[in-house]
Curated annotation (Swiss-Prot):
Taxonomic lineage: Eukaryota, Viridiplantae, Streptophyta, Embryophyta, Tracheophyta
Gene Ontology biological-process annotations: translation
Protein known as: Small ribosomal subunit protein uS15c
Gene3D superfamilies: S15/NS1, RNA-binding (1.10.287.10)
Keyword set, alphabetical order: Chloroplast, Plastid, Ribonucleoprotein, Ribosomal protein
Family classification: Belongs to the universal ribosomal protein uS15 family.
Top-level lineage group: Eukaryota
Chief subcellular location: plastid
GO cellular component: chloroplast; ribonucleoprotein complex; ribosome
UniProt keyword Chloroplast, yes or no: yes
Gene it is expressed from: rps15-A
Compartments it resides in: Plastid, Chloroplast
Disulfide bridge partners, by residue number: none
Organism this protein belongs to: Sorghum bicolor (Sorghum)
MF term (GO), any: structural constituent of ribosome
């Protein structure tokens, strides 16, 4: 459901958060197998920061869209 509606506007905050979430999950599973891959761990931390900043922006601008997005993507709220 999220994919279909987000492919229309790749610049939207929701699509960017969705994309970062997929990359984060993929990197997290990679790091479970390769615990000493520190460059990937650094990349994961960068992605987490970018996603966190986008979510903070969305929460400030439109709380309803923010709540809907974190529930769809199963992300914890800070």
């Amino acid at each position: 459901m999220v994919k279909e509606e987000k492919q229309e506007n790749r610049g939207s905050v929701e699509f960017q958060v969705f994309s970062f979430t997929n990359k984060i999950r993929r990197l997290a599973s990679h790091l479970e197998l390769h615990k000493k891959d520190f460059s990937s761990e650094r990349g994961l931390r960068r992605l987490l920061g970018k996603r966190q900043r986008l979510l903070a922006y969305l929460a400030k601008k439109n709380r309803v869209r923010y709540k809907k997005l974190i529930s769809q993507l199963d992300i914890r709220e800070k």
